[in-house]
Amino acid sequence: LSIKPGDAKVTVDTSKNGLAQDENGNWYYYKNGVIDTSYTGIAPNAYGWWRVVNGAVDFNCNSVEANEYGWFCIRGGKVDFDYTGIAQNAYGWWRIVNGAVDFNCNSVEANEYGWFYLRGGKVDFNYNGLAANAYGWWKITGGAVDFNYTGMAQNEYGLWHVVNGMVDFSR
């Protein structure tokens, strides 16, 4: 048995574009019916927005990644539009509101690791001083609220008494 050119024909469905499942149940990003291995980004389909790496959906991605609409928190490969908190990627820790990075956040916010000072939406691990949020003013050391600090701390408004990391205005 020998096969010569032209004996077998492969049909490509060129209408397949964007995210779709192949016959084995794997999800890929298609362009003109072919898996686009050059594509890395976030792509939408009917089930959500997904992290794609080299043309394949990366269901193991837990990060903050970007597409043309902004930066988003990804859990299990999917943008988590319900998440509000602080999430990490290779560039730092970011304030997330409804799944998207809030680059306007200048506050003290919390995640499962503690309370952190954010400037421009990013945790500033170099910040040392006092900073406020909706719950009060806090002593920040290395970008995190120092709940072990009791003593005096100064900022541009004066010298303040701090108890367990929080400014005590009653003294």
Which positions does each model-derived feature cover?
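Extracellular adhesion/carbohydrate-binding repeat motifs centered on closely spaced tryptophans
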Residues: 1-171
